[in-house]
Amino acid sequence: MTLTKPPTAHPSNLDGLHNWITENCSSGAVPVLTGMNGDMDTVGSAISLAASNSNMMACGLHLGRISKRVCERLNAPFRKISNSSDLPKRLSAVIIVDAASSSQVGFDLPDDIPKCIIDHHASNNWELKDGDIYINMPVSATTEIIADYLATYSPETMTKPVRELLLAGLLTDSGRFKHNQKESFRSANVILDNSDIDLSLIHI
């Protein structure tokens, strides 16, 4: 099945996402793949989401300049891979973040396992099969979707480094709120809630 439009965003999207992650992580490795441009939104989303389950690991072809600097500063776990053969042998499923099509991953994905796509782009060129799930919300950055998911289903994952990764993704994709949607301010509040992070001190 090919979706020509993203599904309408509503809270049950995150319910479905949580159920999908729980089910697939219970039976094997679930790599969280970035878009091949390696920008801060895709990398921040992947590392933050992967931190919520020991069977997930953030992977991708490339770290962009900002992503590399932020990951080195935070000692954030990210595995560089060149193709699908570098993925774990016992795969349960794959998650792809911040990519509007499979071509944006940079290599062919395995056909025989479920996939989850989490994205904020209006365009969608994914072909979905049984067992796949597609989450798309009209926000400025994919890290906003990940922040809502973690705050609701895995609040213990919202450590200071994870919050900084989420913020970095939001700030870069929104141009530090210069071309953001109103929802981005709410997302920033979710990320900063009960933390000692000073937004003005986040340099990217």
Go through the PLM ranges and name each one.
Residues M1-N37, S45-N53, W126-I202:
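A structured phosphate/pyrophosphate-recognition subdomain
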Residues S27-P88:
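Anionic-ligand anchoring segments at beta-strand to alpha-helix junctions in alpha/beta enzyme folds, i.e.
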Residues S52-L63, I81-K89, Q104-P110, H179-L192:
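Short, Lys/Arg-enriched charge-dense amphipathic segments
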Residues M56-A58, K115, L166:
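Hydrophobic/aromatic residues located in beta-strands of well-ordered beta-sheets
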Residues E72-D132:
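Active-site cofactor/cluster-binding pocket
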